[in-house]
């Protein structure tokens, strides 16, 4: 299997690994033989796919808010990942209206914290940053503007630093 050759025995950070979709990604990477470190808040639902499927077994399961740049940097530097899949976010549209500051801090500045943590690494690292379909300037839903902001910021960071 081609993907097994890529990910087997590689160190991979997955942010947001306790969420439903990302827990599936984490399980898949484990099956491919990756050494996974998941960084996330507690599972968002009870029961959760993450806990029921016991995805936490056999990975480094870290509870950490991506808004905490210093702690995030320490984890990245100590782990020395070969790959990072960044999917941690505050994904709920309703909550983004109730608490826009936390949503922006998590989704935009959290992504910047991941990028800064990558920049501190001494080793080469591949990164995949996944946001949502809302980043395509959905003018009916204001929520999408923060995703688009995140997409633009990532592009600027990549062009200016790498």
Which residues does each predicted region cover?
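Hydrophobic alpha-helical segments, chiefly the membrane-spanning helices
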Residues: 157-162
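N-terminal Rossmann-like NAD(P)+-binding domain of SDR-like oxidoreductases, especially those catalyzing
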Residues: 1-156
């Amino acid at each position: 299997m081609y993907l097994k050759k890529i990910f087997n025995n590689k160190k991979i950070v997955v942010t947001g690994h306790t969420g439903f979709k990302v827990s599936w990604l984490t399980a898949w990477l484990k099956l491919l033989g990756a050494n996974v470190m998941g960084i996330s808040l507690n599972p968002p639902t009870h029961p959760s796919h993450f806990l029921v499927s016991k995805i936490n077994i056999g990975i480094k399961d870290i509870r950490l808010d991506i808004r905490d740049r210093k702690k995030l940097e320490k984890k990245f530097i100590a782990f020395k990942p070969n790959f990072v899949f960044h999917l941690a976010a505050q994904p709920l549209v309703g909550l983004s209206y109730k608490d826009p500051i936390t949503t922006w801090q998590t989704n935009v500045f959290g992504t910047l914290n991941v990028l800064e943590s990558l920049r501190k690494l001494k080793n080469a690292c591949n990164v995949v940053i996944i946001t949502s379909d809302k980043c395509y300037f959905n003018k009916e839903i204001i929520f999408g503007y923060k995703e688009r902001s995140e997409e633009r910021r990532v592009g600027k960071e990549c062009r200016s630093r790498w």
